[in-house]
């Protein structure tokens, strides 16, 4: 081969065992590489960390790397939890399981597998769901924070690329098998949940060339539980209101209570297969297949103290606490007293059916099948490197749900005189010590007994909501890449073309019935075979004494296994009871359908350079995208019949994305990096659709798409310094700055509520705000029973202002292996630590206080005309976060302990409501989590270990309005232990 590669280029090509095989280089080049550049083999924690560090060091852009053993010895069960180890990355969790990833404060990232785009189960753009990917099938991963022109567009924070084992790089036959069992501290199921994973790989050579194959698979079950108590105190009893409960001061009464028991049962199957063939030293062909099946069954329950607000005028708290709201939008919101402990009694003279006890069974499950296929080849000549591949990613998801609600009919209190299917139950509450605790006031008048609470005759059917929505996502792509090598300061020129076609299709398949009268609601003895006692261990997490222990729900396990049978039984009960309503099987909703496709053509050109201590690349990426959206237009004729017609809209856009990366090796052990580039973030598919889906509840907002939503534009700058002061050790500091234009933000419009009665508009159109929901229950928001009410709306819009994200990242990795003579056994220790400080500023899109919240703020500020609003900012961004890992590896023992902490951040994940409480995203308080693992090599072929997640059972606290203001939600999570 005439072209001669530089040592730096050779280092990049020879890194580790996880990259693509570079067998296509000529023997002369391979020999030089082997002589001049150290190749680090992955074997054990220490070696894998060193290998990952070496790979990062010789990259021409800013990339973070984790490799095989590094992943395998962490107590991480899915992709999100693996990524939490990287500087600048935080994760969000659902019931303790990592489900979301923020890179440099943003969720707007991309996920690839072997460089192929992935698609998720929903309608987002970030790729495959993080909880769907088992850590056991990942051989390594890269997070590109500063892209080059080759990098596919679409990420704001970074691009995550998962790597699988390359067959032709195996130096010997690979065979491994792992068996584990996991236990959750809060689950009611006994025993261990199984986890199995295995890998086989080998390569061989004959007259037709060299062949290699790797097959990996995993099967895992997981049972995770979290308790999420909720207390609403978003109303006002003014001192001058004249009601019986009024005090000499204004205070916040109790509005609503929820005892939310979340349980998710995961069954995850992953398969990865790779085949490679190299007919000669210059040519390689490959085929990859990644198949994932994820089944997440929800078996959750909710106990609700509803109608509590009806007693606000007479219920006097026993004690109060002072709530300081802080400031929003530059306005000091002052402070107020809030109910802390007390009893909400039954007062038949005031209200003959409130407060009441409502019992729900939630089974919002997800079944997803994801497939990724990749076929391609590459050829290396004297001056050229050419590669081409076709790839297909798909994800088909069904979200089966069968949610039911029962009302408890208290036999010690009279039936509602108006015929409603609920009646009064007394409650008590104690919110001291940061515990949102409530339960039945057992010593109060009309209190039911345990036997009465568990008697099927004392519950009636209230709601049935069935859904079987489907989402089909795909991306098919073809790309070809060329490299021309030069013997100048410009070492090579890369250029290429990529075509992709992506789409998302959704069908809203549902049915529902709401029963509001005793005349229509069958009692539980008519469907008693469906009823079970709800979980009675709500005190296991924090030892609380006050909670609702005894109640009945429709068996969520039976619903999951036989939904049609449950539906048939409920309909038979309604028929026997003589109900005027009926339950139908789920059908497709015309208003909830959309089918969106986009085609993209992308070209790039990039020059790679190396001169003395400088190296890097500069280039440009150009793309054109055309979007076609199909939805339904629904009108009503003169006779009231629904007329459905399909409407197709098209749009297009193009962008030029320049990118540059410069690396300076200023000393043998010091590297400086600079990166600058432009990228875009496309809107989520459902944010473009004008299709709408209504809920039978008056509380959730209705999501309305925005077909005029345009991609975000982001310009990023990176500056970093890395000091490799010892073998396998580094200290680094980096600065990043991102300017975002047309940020996608949530615009929420809340319906008007009368400050005295709390009633909403019950007729269409909703002049005071929101949208008319024809099937929503009026509930406490109107004077009479029925359906049809104004509810809130939420729509994604482009922020008209420019926003900025900037921050500093610090990291240190230190290994004591070099001090074995001085330290002996203690030389097995090592430490990794990172710290990120970041901030978000700018933007003009604002959230505004709800009408009830405005009444409270008028009282706390003395300004009756106050209008409180604040820039929404960026959700899920913690300004400060750190991660510390201490490990030990010696004498066959491999142990790690990792503590992760992140500062408070605003979130839209706040349990049993989808509306912004008080009109603003909730604030999730500071939280840390401790994980650990210990493994021991019994011999060369057998390893045993134990892993622990959330050892200290760290709780989640969420506040309304501001951090530390009004505690609204809790998340009491489990500890999970895995052995094997």
Predicted regions span which residues?
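Extracytoplasmic beta-strand/coil segments of soluble accessory domains associated
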Residues: 80-118, 145
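C-terminal beta-signal and adjacent terminal beta-strands/loops
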Residues: 517, 739-741, 900-913, 935-980
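N-terminal periplasmic "start-of-domain" segments of outer-membrane beta-barrel proteins
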Residues: 41-72, 116-121
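Gram-negative outer-membrane beta-barrel transporters
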Residues: 739, 749, 756-911, 952
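Outer-membrane beta-barrel signature, preferentially recognizing the C-terminal barrel domain
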Residues: 366-370, 596-599, 651, 680-740, ...
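Transmembrane beta-barrel wall of Gram-negative outer-membrane proteins
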Residues: 189-341, 346, 366-376, 382, ...
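Short loop/turn motifs that connect adjacent beta-strands in outer-membrane beta-barrel proteins
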Residues: 151, 167-173, 205-211, 282, ...
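Short acidic/polar hinge/loop motifs at secondary-structure boundaries
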Residues: 118-145, 198
